[in-house]
Amino acid sequence: MKQELCEAGVDAFGANLAYDGGNYGVSLTYGVLESGVNENKYTALNGYYSLDNGISLSAGYELGDLGGNAATADESQAYFFGVNGEVGPGELGAAIGTAGSMTEVAGAIPEQIMYEAYYSYAVNDGMTVTPLIYVKEGATTAASDETGIMVKTSFSF
């Protein structure tokens, strides 16, 4: 099969409007993914607020319209809420949210939630270590939950 130089494919475009007010910020994002026949549209609202005591709160919500799908399966949504702040020599954080984007099934959107907690600390001037634990709920009540532990090490020179 011969490939054309300008073969039609997937097109994506988006726009973002954001405001940063120092100790708070908000962004509104719109995106479209076109695959020739179908057009998926996504809108998201994200924000953060930093308290005077060093604790930061962040949250986000995304809603998608899945073009070309049946009326009972044409929406998706995702959301998260997080909190972090300085504890000792590092930063402690936790978050709860959807495990990716949830897609409507038979007129309802099933929730698959994920939880995480981390502690990030500098070992020296050029290296940061971040241990993390997470729990991801099973996609159905019959499916097993997933628990994971990982360690991220970041280097800078």
Give the ranges of each region predicted by the language model.
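Acidic carboxylate-rich catalytic motifs and surrounding loops in phosphoryl-/glycosyl-chemistry enzymes
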Residues: 1, 29, 133
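Surface-exposed loop and membrane-interface regions of Gram-negative outer-membrane beta-barrel proteins
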Residues: 2-11, 36, 67-70, 137-145
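Long, contiguous hydrophobic alpha-helical segments, chiefly transmembrane helices and signal peptides
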Residues: 60, 95, 119, 127-129
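C-terminal structured domain segments
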Residues: 115-123
